[in-house]
Amino acid sequence: MPLNIIGTALLDGTDKIPYYQTIKKVAPYVLATGAIKYWSRGPSNTWERKLHGKVYLVTGATSQGMGTSVAYKMAELGAQLIILTREVDEWVTEWCEELREKTKNELIFVEKCDLSNLWEIRKFATSWLDNSPPRRLDGVIVMSGDMEPWGIPKISLPQRRSSKDGLELQIATNYVAIFHLLNLLQPSFKAQPPDRDVRIILATCWLQVVGDINIEDPLWQNAKYKSALKFFASSKLQLGLSMMELQRRLTEDIKNQKTNGAERTGKNVTITMVQPGTMRSNSLRRVISNGSVVLLIILYCILLYPILWLFTKSGRRGDQSFLYALMTPELEEVNLKDTKVKYISDCSIVKFARKEFDDEELQKKLFDNTERDILQLEKKVAAKRNANKTGNQNSKKKSQNKSRKDD
């Protein structure tokens, strides 16, 4: 067909081509739209890596967007996945079975671990570490996160939601939970053999550039809730800074180990922050709709969707930078020039935008204060939990004694 059109234009002139004038007017707009869409979808990962026999902990895999796409690709390549979910209900069980069938990989499992609950995180980490010999672990892929509606100025103020531990939900889920999980799993990372390429890959967001760092109150327990965006951006910023310190600690501890008398470089365990780009994700839908179904239909689905389709990625296109971080040989020990945390955007390693990423003293203080405050909060919540348990037991005994007297 294109050859016939070109031949007609060359031999008989463009006047012989049907609807040529219409095509001439419309074509530039079509080409421009195609070019914008090609740019907005971002580059594709070109690396491949065999994952057979490798074991990964994965969060955010049930999102039906980027997380699901990454998990599907990893399962397809033969990886054993332990997927952490808030609940292991009927839907999650069916989803897991479907993923096994589609990828022909039976080594996909789901574990209950609510990342908004510090106690559940500690229970999971303790059960993971309570094994001899140490369990194999080739990486942790963190794609979970929470973004609360920003509210509408002068109409609808942002509503603060809290985790089970009383923390603001975005700080709890995006920062505290991931920090706590990875900090507790340090012994597992250090126990891996020197020839094992262990990759810890975490999702971040370009909005971190507008975040704040609360050194003295890193869990933001005493901060006023004026802006949901500020809490979200700060959670991502503090996560990135804390991971810089965690990487240094892991590297130094591994370097101090000796395997059969051989020195270790500590480069076999790497932490990478991935910025997948602006996607048409559940988070974006919640922000645009302000949590309203009516606004979701009118504003997102009808009015803004053509623009969003043109300038943003689909949730499944956002997986490319994650797959790049998982598969690129640039992060292998033999190719690493330094042990710093890497920042990946659009399938390439780029520099962090904030100057705080060069401040090691600030990162160390943030890490230490976060670790301290989490421990204090855990003790406080545990005391309350034990008090409630004791109260329930006493109430049960009283009711039993009363029923005996009545008999």
Swiss-Prot record:
Q: Could you tell me which residue ranges are on the Cytoplasmic side of the membrane?
A: 312-407
Q: What does this protein do?
A: May be involved in lipid metabolism.
Q: What else is known?
A: Present with 13900 molecules/cell in log phase SD medium.
What are the protein's UniProt keywords?
A: Coiled coil, Endoplasmic reticulum, Membrane, NADP, Oxidoreductase, Transmembrane, Transmembrane helix
Annotated spans, Disordered: 383-407
Q: Name one Pfam family in it.
A: adh_short
**What are the coiled-coil residue ranges?**
361-390
In the record, the note on similarity to other proteins reads: Belongs to the short-chain dehydrogenases/reductases (SDR) family.
Q: Where is the active site?
A: 236
Q: Which GO terms describe its cellular component?
A: endoplasmic reticulum; endoplasmic reticulum membrane; nuclear envelope
Which Gene Ontology molecular function entries are recorded, alphabetically?
A: oxidoreductase activity, acting on the CH-OH group of donors, NAD or NADP as acceptor
Compositional bias of kind Basic residues: 395-407
> Which coarse location class applies to the principal site listed for this UniProt protein?
endoplasmic reticulum
- The EC code for this enzyme is 1.-.-.-
- State the InterPro entries in the record: NAD(P)-bd_dom_sf, SDR_fam
Summarize where NADP(+) binds, as residue positions: 114, 236, 281
Q: Give residue spans on the Lumenal membrane side.
A: 1-290
Q: How does it sit in the membrane?
A: Single-pass membrane protein
Q: Membrane-spanning residues where?
A: 291-311
Which cysteine-cysteine pairs are annotated as disulfide bonds in the entry?
A: none
User: What name does UniProt use for this protein?
Assistant: Uncharacterized oxidoreductase YNL181W
Question: Where, subcellularly, is it found?
Answer: Endoplasmic reticulum membrane
